Amino acid sequence: MSGRGKGGKGLGKGGAKRHRKVLRDNIQGITKPAIRRLARRGGVKRISGLIYEETRGVLKVFLENVIRDAVTYTEHAKRKTVTAMDVVYALKRQERTLYGFGG
């Protein structure tokens, strides 16, 4: 091995990085009907029009926190792939224990 670390294969200096599409406004992918279905599952009968944007905002903050913690676990384990267990541990750290995904 020539100083490439664990599993370092390949030749050259690393190669060009692929262009990644800039991610923005993806929160709009959480559609109004999807939010409605979640509310129905929670027993809600009528929904105010202002709820949809508020829900998207709250969901975005929640996911940012969980993903940040999950990525921290991944980096600490010197991996590049976030596993289901990383997410389970991240949720457990936030006192939102999730069962059924190993561990």
UniProtKB/Swiss-Prot annotation:
Its main location: nucleus. There is a cross-link at K32 (Glycyl lysine isopeptide (Lys-Gly) (interchain with G-Cter in UFM1)). The modification Omega-N-methylarginine is found at R4. Keywords: Acetylation, Chromosome, Citrullination, DNA-binding, Hydroxylation, Isopeptide bond, Methylation, Nucleosome core, Nucleus, Phosphoprotein, Ubl conjugation. Residues 1-14 have a biased composition (Gly residues). There is a cross-link at K92 (Glycyl lysine isopeptide (Lys-Gly) (interchain with G-Cter in ubiquitin)). It is found in: Nucleus; Chromosome. The modification N6-glutaryllysine is found at K6, K13, K32, K60, K78, K80, K92. The modification N6-propionyllysine is found at K9, K17, K32, K45, K78, K80, K92. The modification N-acetylserine is found at S2. The modification Asymmetric dimethylarginine is found at R4. The modification N6-succinyllysine is found at K32, K78, K92. The modification N6-butyryllysine is found at K6, K9, K13, K17, K32, K45, K78, K80, K92. PANTHER family: HISTONE H4. Belongs to the histone H4 family. This is Histone H4 type VIII. It comes from Gallus gallus (Chicken). The lineage of its organism: Eukaryota, Metazoa, Chordata, Craniata, Vertebrata. The gene is H4-VIII.
